[in-house]
Amino acid sequence: MLKRTPLFSVYARCGAKTIEFGGWEMPVQFSSIKEEHEAVRTRAGLFDVSHMGEIVVRGRGSLAFLQKLMTNDVAKLRPGRAQYTLMCYEDGGTVDDLLIYQKGENDYLLVVNAANTEKDFAWLSGHVEGDVELQDVSSETAQLALQGPAAERVLQRLTDFDLAALRPFSFADGVEVSGVKALVSRTGYTGEDGFELYCKAEDAAALWEAILAAGARDSVLPCGLGARDTLRFEACLPLYGQELSDSISPVEAGLGFAVKTEKETPFIGQAVLKRQKEEGPPRRLVGIEMIDRGIPRHGYLVFADGEEVGFVTTGTQSPTLKKNIGLALVKADVAAIGREVEVDIRGKRLKANIVPIPFYRRAK
């Protein structure tokens, strides 16, 4: 039986087409993926991301506990700030990537990938020492994401809180948005400015309807996972199971900025990740742009000089760039910009170039 978010009953009214994703029945699109993608790049789009997992970490030992498990330096956080980080195995493979919100002293909220929530909770629980309390609050929490250049303007119509005061990766808790108490965070997964809002599950439908109504004059669209994927892909934001996995390290995936091997507290996977940062990883995530006609898809093999050198992690025809592009994990010695490679597409080896990433970066 697939899980459903608190907004499932709203989908039908919005014309959603649903699919299975990580054990959830989720909307892949409402109008079309291209329309929704364009709405976020040019105006704003509203996503239901209530399938994501939320785990509360409290207790006097919280910081030491998180420092031991996280690649980033959690000690740099302050109340009201969020941080992107990862958890790794001893061999450097990735348990998950996540956001940490520091709500107060010894009070943290972890937001993890939907398909990994149970695995992550078990991993965290297995490493608890001292005064640390874990609580999985996923089922009672809803998460909406309003993303795009018009996001601040639209959301400001619903709250007296000054959203301009929120910098990227900062948040405020207990903000009243159209009568609903929410944690409002200036974060997202699209490459655009925007906000993620966490509220009680029972308040989600009212908040969803209020945001869409407030955004009507800006042509804000409800958006599904299809557009969320093409948007994050153009911005080269990783998806667990594709750019990250238990056999792909954060350094290989180009996420070394979130791996603080010099922090005082040793963390799981530190030795391998430190070596990869210092000596270079065996593989690197690169961008590829097709020369021949064809679309690189997840799992397609990549060749250089007749030798298999890696595989495509994500690929599509970019709605913004109108090009057939992909991300690929390849041997480090072939990961040079301008290098010609071949992608095996349905038994044919088609030419592509390695190109700079991210494919898309919004104008500041």
From Swiss-Prot:
Gene label: gcvT
GO MF entry, a single one: aminomethyltransferase activity
Protein name in the entry: Aminomethyltransferase
Organism field: Geobacillus kaustophilus (strain HTA426)
Family: Belongs to the GcvT family.
One BP term from GO: glycine decarboxylation via glycine cleavage system
Reaction catalysis annotation: N(6)-[(R)-S(8)-aminomethyldihydrolipoyl]-L-lysyl-[protein] + (6S)-5,6,7,8-tetrahydrofolate = N(6)-[(R)-dihydrolipoyl]-L-lysyl-[protein] + (6R)-5,10-methylene-5,6,7,8-tetrahydrofolate + NH4(+)
Domain of life: Bacteria
Coiled-coil zones: none
